[in-house]
Amino acid sequence: DKAIATSLVNADIVVIESFTKYCEILIETAQKMYKGYDVWSYYNKAIRKTLDSLKNEKSTVVITAIDEIVKIMQPTGGEYNTRRIKVQGKVHEGCIEKELLLVLFTEVRRGKDSIEYCFQTNSDGITSAKTPLGLFKDLYIPNDLNTVITSLEKYYA
């Protein structure tokens, strides 16, 4: 918490590498300190506190995370797959992205003689990728975080 607070005051760009590892450490800590429901209560409150602390008007905050494919049951009985940020527990499952302004998913696109590393900028119906309207004209852009940050700076200038 102190490191994040200090970074948000002193840096223009803050990178949280990796949110997934942070959640793993958080659950391990909670399991050492608490039992039963108190483990999940501590875990969920800590995630909420962290997500809230990252919201600011000064710094651009970049969070990396591992994604997972989750089967979702529809009211009709059918299923569909969705790809989203992986977290343990149910409270924040599928909900982390709603706290973020921009969500990019990495994609590896293989051509006949090439491999292209990309960011997916908006949902294809499976991912929870999202960007502000008009920020990027293409569904896939080069995997270059500097370009993304420069685009954000121009967009909000």
Predicted regions and their residues:
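General structural signal for secondary-structure boundaries
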Residues: 1, 32-33, 144-145
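A generic alpha-helix structural signal
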Residues: 1, 51, 149-152
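Short glycine-rich substrate-engagement loop in P-loop NTPases that contacts/grips substrate
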Residues: 1-7
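Short, high-confidence coil segments that cap the C-terminus of an alpha-helix
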Residues: 9-11
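P-loop NTPase motor core
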Residues: 13-95
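Conserved GTP-binding G-domain of TRAFAC-class P-loop NTPases and closely related GTPase folds
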Residues: 70-157
